[in-house]
Amino acid sequence: MGLPEERRKSGSGSRAREETGAEGRVRGWSPPPEVRRSAHVPSLQRYRELHRRSVEEPREFWGNIAKEFYWKTACPGPFLQYNFDVTKGKIFTEWMKGATTNICYNVLDRNVHEKKLGDKVAFYWEGNEPGETTKITYRELLVQVCQFSNVLRKQGIQKGDRVAIYMPMILELVVAMLACARLGALHSIVFAGFSAESLCERILDSSCCLLITTDAFYRGEKLVNLKELADESLEKCREKGFPVRCCIVVKHLGRAELGMNDSPSQSPPVKRPCPDVQICWNEGVDLWWHELMQQAGDECEPEWCDAEDPLFILYTSGSTGKPKGVVHTIGGYMLYVATTFKYVFDFHPEDVFWCTADIGWITGHSYVTYGPLANGATSVLFEGIPTYPDEGRLWSIVDKYKVTKFYTAPTAIRMLMKFGDDPVTKHSRASLQVLGTVGEPINPEAWLWYHRVVGSQRCPIVDTFWQTETGGHMLTPLPGATPMKPGSASFPFFGVAPAILNESGEELEGEAEGYLVFKQPWPGIMRTVYGNHTRFETTYFKKFPGYYVTGDGCRRDQDGYYWITGRIDDMLNVSGHLLSTAEVESALVEHEAVAEAAVVGHPHPVKGECLYCFVTLCDGHTFSPTLTEELKKQIREKIGPIATPDYIQNAPGLPKTRSGKIMRRVLRKIAQNDHDLGDTSTVADPSVINHLFSHRCLTTQ
C-alpha cells in the first residue's frame, strides 16, 4: 500500500502519528492531538460505545437526536418498524411514521428565528470564472425560498407533485430544491451534464409537471446551452404524450442584461458575456424566473408533512439499463444527513465546509444542501471545474474562503496528482482541518498524496463509503477517533450494522471477503424505487433475504477494517458516477450498424474505471474510425458525456455460454490483456476469445 514510503516522508515532524503493529508494519495514522481535543468523538473507545448503543438501541439513539428538530406533531406510534425479509412479506422501513415536520422549516426558519443565525453566511458562491463571487445569508436564503415557493404555488404545484430541476451549480438551484421541500413537492434533480434523452426519461418516469432550468452556463471553457437541451427534452416528452405544462428559466449567462432590481439573487453578472447563445422561447410554457420572483411575496407557510412522506426522487443507474428513481423520505433522511455531517466532518459552528460534488448527485443533495444547512453551516458552492483557469483553482478557493473541511472525489485527486505538487503547495491551505473522499474507493497512492501534499500530513482523511440508496455515510472514519488506513473506509457509522456474506448467504466472521450487506435499517435508507416497489425488493433484498444488499464486494481485515473491493453486479464506477453496462449497451445497439454490444470496465489512472466496448456489426457495415466516433456521439446524446467510452473494439463474435449468455468475466480479461482466464469450459466457441485478444485496443493501463 505504500505505507513504509509515506512513513519515510513523514519524518519526526508529522503531527499525524503512525501506529505500528507487533511486526513493525504500519497499521494507520492516529488522529492528530489537536483534532482529538475538540472532536465530538475523541477516541476509538467512545466511538465503539456510541456505535454499540446505536445498533442495539436504535429507537432510543435516534429518538434523542430527533429531539433536536422541530416536529409539528409527535410520533403517535412505534418510532421504528421494518421488514428486510422478502419471505415474510412486503419490504418496508418506517421511522417516526405519523409525526409531522418540514425539512425546509428545520434547515432555514429555525436557524434564522430560533438559533439567531440569520446573518450567518449560508453559501459563498464561486462562479466558473475567478472573480464571479457572491454570498447569501440564512435570512436572505429563507426569503428567496419563500418567494419561489409562492411562485410554485401560483403555478399550481401542490404537496406530492414532482418537479424536475435541470440546472448548474448556482444559488437558484438550492432555492428551487428547498422551495419544493417547503411545499411538500418532490424535487427530481437531473445532473446538468446529462443529455436531453436522459432528462426526458426521468421526467416521464415520475410524471414531473414542471421543469426548472437555466439559459446556459460555462463549465471551464465549454459553453453548455442548457435551455436548448431542455427544449429538446420537452419536445421528446410531448412526442410521447406527456406535455410538461411549465418551464421556469433562470437567466444566468444573460444576468448582465437584468437591471439591479430585476436580479432574483445576489449573483453577479458573469464575467464572460455570451451574446451568441440563442434562447428559443416557447410562449405558454416558458417563464422567466426573475419576472416571477418580482411578483412573489416573501412569506410562505410551510406544508406540514408526515415523516414518511417522500422528499425527493434521485435517479441512479440500474443493472437493467433503466434508471431507478430512488425515493428518500423527509424525517429519516433529515436525521441521517444532519447527524452524518456533524460527526463525519466533526462540524463546529466556525467551520467553512466545501463539498465539490454537483447537487445533481446524492453527495450534493446530502452534503452541499441538506446536511450543512441542518447544522447551520457555512458552505462553498462552486460552479466551475478543478482545472480552470489553472490546476490550482481548488486551493485558491480554499485559501480565499478559509475552508476548514474539504470533501471531494478520488477521481479529482488522481487528476490533480498528474500536475505535481506545485499547484497545491503554492497555496497556503493552512485553514484545512479535515479532508474527505467520496464516490469510489480511493487507491492508497492517491490517499497518500492527498494526505501528504494537500493536507500537509496534519489532516485526518474520512474515506466515506455510501450510496444514492443509503442517503448518507455508511462506512467511514471519524476525524478524532479512527486510526486511518489508506484505502479503507474503516468502520460503520452510527446505526449501521454491516455483515459480509458468502455466496450461500452465510455471515463470515473475522477476516473475510464477500458480499457487503446491512442487517438493519438506518434512518436514511431509501424507501422504494419510484413507481416500482417490486424492483426495489428484487434489487436490494431478494438475493439474501433479511439483508439490504449493496451490490458491492468487501473485505474485512484482521483489525476489523472494511475495504470496498468494487461492484459485484454489472455496474461501472466512472469518476465516482455509477453507470449501467446495460444502459450503454442499449445506446450502442440503437445504431443501425451495431447488431450486438457488450460493455465492461477497464482500469483508468484518473477515472478509476473507464468503458471498454465490444461491438458486433450488422452485415454490410464496416468498422472504422468514423463509426467509432458516431458511436461515441450516440452514447453522449443518449446518456451524457460521462458515459463516453475510452475504447471501442470490433468483435465479430462475443464469448458466450452454450445457453447464449455473454461471459463478461472473459471480456474484462481481454480488455486488460490478461490471459489468465480461469475456467472457459462453458464457452461455446473458444476461437472467439483468441480473435478478440489479437484485435484488442491498445490501452494505457
UniProtKB/Swiss-Prot annotation:
Region (Interaction with TFEB), start-end ranges: 1-107
Signal peptide, first to last residue: none
Pfam family, one: AMP-binding_C
Description of how activity is regulated: Inhibited by acetylation at Lys-661 and activated by deacetylation mediated by the deacetylases SIRT1 and SIRT3.
GO cellular component terms, semicolon-separated: cytoplasm; cytosol; nucleus
Binding site for ATP: 439-441, 463-468, 552, 567
Gene3D superfamilies the record matches: 3.30.300.30, N-terminal domain of ligase-like
List of residues that carry Phosphoserine: 30, 263, 265, 267, 659
InterPro entries in the record: ACAS_N, AMP-bd_C, AMP-bd_C_sf, AMP-binding_CS, AMP-dep_synth/lig_dom, ANL_N_sf
Reactions listed under catalytic activity: acetate + ATP + CoA = acetyl-CoA + AMP + diphosphate; propanoate + ATP + CoA = propanoyl-CoA + AMP + diphosphate
UniProt modified residues of type N6-acetyllysine: 418, 661
Location of this chain's protein in the cell: Cytoplasm, Cytosol; Cytoplasm; Nucleus
Subunit composition and interactions: Monomer. Interacts with TFEB. AMPK-mediated phosphorylated form at Ser-659 interacts with KPNA1; this interaction results in nuclear translocation of ACSS2. Interacts with the 'Thr-172' phosphorylated form of PRKAA2. Interacts with CREBBP.
Family named by the database record: Belongs to the ATP-dependent AMP-binding enzyme family.
Function of the protein: Catalyzes the synthesis of acetyl-CoA from short-chain fatty acids. Acetate is the preferred substrate but can also utilize propionate with a much lower affinity. Nuclear ACSS2 promotes glucose deprivation-induced lysosomal biogenesis and autophagy, tumor cell survival and brain tumorigenesis. Glucose deprivation results in AMPK-mediated phosphorylation of ACSS2 leading to its translocation to the nucleus where it binds to TFEB and locally produces acetyl-CoA for histone acetylation in the promoter regions of TFEB target genes thereby activating their transcription.
Identification of the protein by name: Acetyl-coenzyme A synthetase, cytoplasmic
Lineage: Eukaryota, Metazoa, Chordata, Craniata, Vertebrata
